[in-house]
Amino acid sequence: MEDLKTTDALSLPVVSDNGGIIEPELQLPQAIPTELENNEEENGTIQQSQSEEDSAENGKIYMDDTFLPSKSQVKETQDSPTTPSFVSPSAEIVLPRVNTKYEAEGTTRNAVSPRPLYSPRSIGSPRALLSPRFAGSSSPLSNGTPISMDSFRDSIDTASPFESVKEAVSKFGGITDWKAHRMKVLERRNFVEQELDKIQEEIPEYKKKSEMVEMSKMLAVEELESTKRLIEELKLNLEKAETEEQQAKQDSELAKLRVQEMEQGIADEASVASKAQLEVAQARHTSAISELESVKEELQTLQNEYDALVKEKDLAVKEAEEAVIASKEVERKVEELTIELIATKESLECAHSSHLEAEEHRIGAAMLRDQETHRWEKELKQAEEELQRLKQHLVSTKELQVKLEFASALLLDLKKELADHKESSKVKEETSETVVTNIEISLQEKTTDIQKAVASAKKELEEVNANVEKATSEVNCLKVASSSLRLEIDKEKSALDSLKQREGMASVTVASLEAEIDITRCEIALVKSKEKETREEMVELPKQLQQASQEADEAKSFAELAREELRKSQEEAEQAKAGASTMESRLFAAQKEIEAIKASERLALAAIKALQESESSSKENAVDSPRTVTLTIEEYYELSKRAHEAEEAANARVAAAVSEVGEAKETEKRSLEKLEEVNKEMVERKATLAGAMEKAEKAKEGKLGVEQELRKWREVSEKKRKNGSSHGKSIQGSKEKEAETSVSNETETNPIPQVNPVKKKKKLFPRFFMFLMKKKSHK
């Protein structure tokens, strides 16, 4: 057992969510009461940590790249108990004011006594205090309340630390092979480019296929229209055939009735068949006349439409000519506007160049003015310094004058004393001649010295006065020069103001020119749009003319077809009339033959009656009735044959029309099947085209992403290169500045080379420098 006496405690550092250490730090919270010593026996013994071992070097324990202080270092910290220390994981952790007592019950294998669980070294271990187990709770020692030591049991993390950063990064999955990643990116980029090239190569093929499909679709549509026209024509022919069949049936029925009536011996006036035949012929005639009138009306409407189309064609031609003339005028205006635009651009460029020249001149004048003002300021400062020196010299000369006056006054006093002494010592002249001579010699020497000093002082005063006069004259000259410089500066300022005004005027003119250019551009855009519209209209005009001509041709063809149908109907009507006339003539001939036969029969009957009367009353076996009509077998066969031929012809026409209708239906089915196949192919090709376009878009997106990555990489590399070049330039600039400062120092220390002036205004400065050099040499 050992006693643990602490006045301060350690607080746990901030722990991240994943249990890692962010910043381990040691603070000095409130003091823990000394009741821990009394409660030590109640809390029981504390298990010792057998995993920790000392390094036996300077009393420090190395654990996880950290070490703890020895006893002497711990005692040294008692002088400053209030200063908190923030310790990083790789620095030394110094515990504040911890007194420990060690028992000598045993030693470890390193000949160091075993440490208890909560010795300063175990408490100071970051692996012990900063374990992830303590992430959710605060330190038990930070509240300042007496807490049992059993709460710290089983909380030491003795895992081996990370040996390197690479191991720590690889443990959390943060290590990557950037070279392999770049190679993968390059391979992916190459693959995307290859896919894009393939898709771009496939796009024209798919376009050709789509064009072929559209052409086939157009052909199928044309075939469908042609088949529809054929079907309509066949329907018309079928209707005509049906009408002809009905007419033939009616004719055959009427012929049969007439034959029956003729067999029955019915007269022409009382025959129903002849009346019905006449009514049918009249109805057909009226229908033909009505059809003729309708066809004439249709022809008249078609003629009117044709005339209207011709008028529209003439109007379209006139409009096209007017549009051509307007387009030529627009082109001429566009050419004039382009010439004006070129001229305005040239004037704008000239104004811009003059503006740049004026700006350069202004900048150069400003630089020269600044340089001149800087030089004049330096020279004025130097002149002021020289004036100060001359003033000091004048003060010293005045002091010398005062001293000279004082010496002359002393000399006069001495002379007076000498005269008094001579008067008083006339008796003792003989004895004091030698003394007087010596005194006179000494006085003469003094007077000569004083006179020499006075003469030298006078000379110096004269020189100082001359120097002062020269300095005042030079100062006046400098003032005149400064006033002239100020006048020049004012002139330059006025020139700058005028230049600024000109620049403002130039900017206004430039803005107006830009506005005019914008207006001209807008007008040009409008003219171009109008040109495009006129060109489109010009392109559409021949199409419209072609359509009008096609419509006119169609109308002509329709009129011709109507005329042909009318002619056919007229021919059929004439044929029907001719057939009716032939039938009437035949009927009339048959009636006459019947009358002749009747007459012959009557004569034969009369003869037979006479013979019967004359002969014995023999019965007549072969007496024909007066109402019966006798026909020869040949005539009967001919009539039956004609009726049968008419029926066969009508049946043949009906069969041909039915076969044509069936063929038309079959062709329509085929065209519909072709259309369905073409539509299916179109859908499939559209799907393939959409897939190809999606692939192309994806490839473009990938390419854009790769290009963005390349741009970012280039920007980063350019920034690095620019930073390196700017660093080099800054070094060169500092060297150049040092060289310039050294040159300026040399020029300041050696002002003699500046004697050769560049301008006439600097003639005053060599005199001033010569005066300074003379003064220095005199001193």
Curated annotation (Swiss-Prot):
Keywords: Coiled coil, Phosphoprotein. Residues 650-661 have a biased composition (Low complexity). Residues 1-119, 650-674, 694-759 are annotated as: Disordered. InterPro entries: Web. It holds the Pfam family WEMBL. The modification Phosphoserine is found at residue 139. Residues 182-503, 532-587, 657-715 form a coiled coil. Residues 662-674, 694-718 have a biased composition (Basic and acidic residues). It comes from the Eukaryota. Residues 79-88, 741-753 have a biased composition (Polar residues). Belongs to the WEB family. PANTHER family: HEAVY CHAIN, PUTATIVE, EXPRESSED-RELATED-RELATED, PROTEIN WEAK CHLOROPLAST MOVEMENT UNDER BLUE LIGHT-LIKE 1. This is Protein WEAK CHLOROPLAST MOVEMENT UNDER BLUE LIGHT-like 1. It comes from Arabidopsis thaliana (Mouse-ear cress). The lineage of its organism: Eukaryota, Viridiplantae, Streptophyta, Embryophyta, Tracheophyta. The gene is WEL1.
